[in-house]
Amino acid sequence: MHHCKRYRSPEPDPYLSYRWKRRRSYSREHEGRLRYPSRREPPPRRSRSRSHDRIPYQRRYREHRDSDTYRCEERSPSFGEDCYGSSRSRHRRRSRERGPYRTRKHAHHCHKRRTRSCSSASSRSQQSSKRSSRSVEDDKEGHLVCRIGDWLQERYEIVGNLGEGTFGKVVECLDHARGKSQVALKIIRNVGKYREAARLEINVLKKIKEKDKENKFLCVLMSDWFNFHGHMCIAFELLGKNTFEFLKENNFQPYPLPHVRHMAYQLCHALRFLHENQLTHTDLKPENILFVNSEFETLYNEHKSCEEKSVKNTSIRVADFGSATFDHEHHTTIVATRHYRPPEVILELGWAQPCDVWSIGCILFEYYRGFTLFQTHENREHLVMMEKILGPIPSHMIHRTRKQKYFYKGGLVWDENSSDGRYVKENCKPLKSYMLQDSLEHVQLFDLMRRMLEFDPAQRITLAEALLHPFFAGLTPEERSFHSSRNPSR
């Protein structure tokens, strides 16, 4: 009789007492999502044909949203971005982060290890030994080979695949220790750098859980973790699609303003909690913001003469804490995914919590219009776009930066007659000109975004202040309340 395979773990990894210091590369762009997927990496922008420059901005955004020249070799890939399975995400993450790292001598062969089959109950032990007769197996890249019907830890039964990325894979499981509740299990590759990044993320998630016992602050909930034969595994609550994936599947039709308002309020609420606990996320983007439930209804838009998907419930969770940094920790020079990276990071002036506020401003614009505000992957062009949209960079920031190669006599060095110069000139305009309507609530949204997109981080609005902004006066009492969810403990 055929038996499904049950895996048991060796002794838990004793890293809980590990005092950690974050180590990241000097130049990192981790763009990577549980149901959580990653970004494509198209050819470098300089290699495009001249005909490409004539592609409309929104279409070019869809095709080249994710390119960048920065690399990150020592981060935890996006929780929301690499899993919950967007093909866009997986393609980009593979091209970005698959490097010459190998932890075994024979990198091109599968690796098998025998499992243990000990159990406290004798009958359970006999069943376990039969189901563990097959070896634990890794593929050539260190991914755990597992199938629907397999078990891990005599607890998690795999019932579906949610996605695979550079860091590993995510599978949907039934947690038999908790009444067959559904969870998303993130299984990290058996590779040292990813294992270490997962340990750092687990420590951050544990700190968040300690501070938010009732799960009122909308951060993704870790319910369990364990080391399975070198694979760090993290169990999370099962959530819906990430907000970028939903946007993409809706043909990049922007979210309605009431949806933008509710998601913005939740984002400010969640990130204020992190900031008050001396933690900066550093990698906020639509991929790392997940719907609790992404069920939708299809509506006909008479104005656009097309059908649109409208999510039924705009409750969200913030995910991917693999790069989150406490105030007392070392702050690397480069943080944040390119499109959401603030000027102080590009100019290497140092960063803190206002870094997240800038990212939220960029995210809100993307929700509102359906495309990124700063569609670029090069520092100089990025700064030029900022000036075209937001006005001149403050002189004191120019004087302080070490990146003087971008400036001459206090101004950006830029050729407006080049193909890149023409592109920026044609497609970047003052922020308010992107408003779809002149009604009060649209004006209020753009006022909030402009305050979040202040060049000087010292002048940028704080999230405590943002929550009091008039834009949020239109929220319903239900939207202002945050219902606690079940918070399972280890």
Swiss-Prot record:
Compartments (UniProt record): Nucleus; Cytoplasm; Cytoplasmic vesicle, Secretory vesicle, Acrosome
Gene Ontology terms, MF aspect: ATP binding; identical protein binding; kinase activity; protein kinase activity; protein serine kinase activity; protein serine/threonine kinase activity; protein serine/threonine/tyrosine kinase activity; protein tyrosine kinase activity
Chief place of localization: nucleus
Top-level taxon of origin: Eukaryota
Biased composition (Basic residues): 88-116
Record's keyword annotation contains 4Fe-4S: no
Phosphotyrosine modifications at: 7
The enzyme's E.C. designation: 2.7.12.1
Binding site for ATP: 162-170, 186
Signal sequence region: none
Annotated Protein kinase domain residues: 156-472
Record keywords: ATP-binding, Cytoplasm, Cytoplasmic vesicle, Kinase, Nucleotide-binding, Nucleus, Phosphoprotein, Serine/threonine-protein kinase, Transferase, Tyrosine-protein kinase
GO terms under biological process: regulation of RNA splicing
Post-translational modification: Autophosphorylates on all three types of residues.
Record PTM Phosphoserine, positions in chain: 9, 49, 51, 67, 76, 78, 135
Bias (Low complexity) ranges: 117-130
Region ranges (Disordered): 1-138
Spans through the membrane: none
Regulation of activity: Leucettine L41 inhibits its kinase activity and affects the regulation of alternative splicing mediated by phosphorylation of SR proteins.
Biased composition (Basic and acidic residues): 26-56, 63-76
Reactions catalysed: L-seryl-[protein] + ATP = O-phospho-L-seryl-[protein] + ADP + H(+); L-threonyl-[protein] + ATP = O-phospho-L-threonyl-[protein] + ADP + H(+); L-tyrosyl-[protein] + ATP = O-phospho-L-tyrosyl-[protein] + ADP + H(+)
Active-site residue list: 283 (proton acceptor)
Recorded family membership: Belongs to the protein kinase superfamily. CMGC Ser/Thr protein kinase family. Lammer subfamily.
Protein name per the record: Dual specificity protein kinase CLK3
